[in-house]
Amino acid sequence: MPLPLPFRAAAALAVGAVTALAAPAASAPAQDRSPATASAGAPAGAFTLSIPSAGIAGLRVMPYEGTTDDRPGTRIQDLGVAASPYGERGGVGPGRVGNLLITAHRLSAGGPLHDLPAADEGDTVLVTAGGVVYTYEIVATRTTSFRSARSLSEQRAAVPGAPGKAATQAMITISTCATPEDHAAGNHWSDAQGNPEHRIDKIGVLRKTSKASAPQGG
């Protein structure tokens, strides 16, 4: 069920906050012997996103060079899939140290992230790429404002919420619009791409990697 604004205080990071989100210091991501954390560089290709607690399973994610919710990214989202920007103004690939950015529509194009707000702290996020499953744990929710350059910098930072801080772990930001909440509050602002002012961001930390299961033969 969509969360009213303001979002849950225990999970939300206020717009403009500079707080870094860190996993417990002693817990490095557990790994099976075979898969390794991906090396630097552009993602090899499309991958999938699953968030069981939000009913999201096998959502196709298309990497592209750019930044969150720019025109190329919005065009990808309009296809009913998710977009993942990389490069100088984007994020990193699955399993890499830094911030894996994923955005998709909540209401239009089939609403693939319609129930993203239902995901809570402690819930599992599965990213499958190149035969490897990267398991992230949601650790926080934050609100991004498209009308605040600072807020956008915090969303896109290598360490979510802390622009300029060097990343030391693999993290993920999954973002979708807060259109219902904005409209309920009387806020009908939108940008050139039709994005409302606010977005709901779920932030996670990589906990383990494992081999993807081989498909069952029919």
Residue ranges and their predicted role:
Residues 133:
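Short glycine/proline-centered loop/turn elements that form peptide/ligand docking sites
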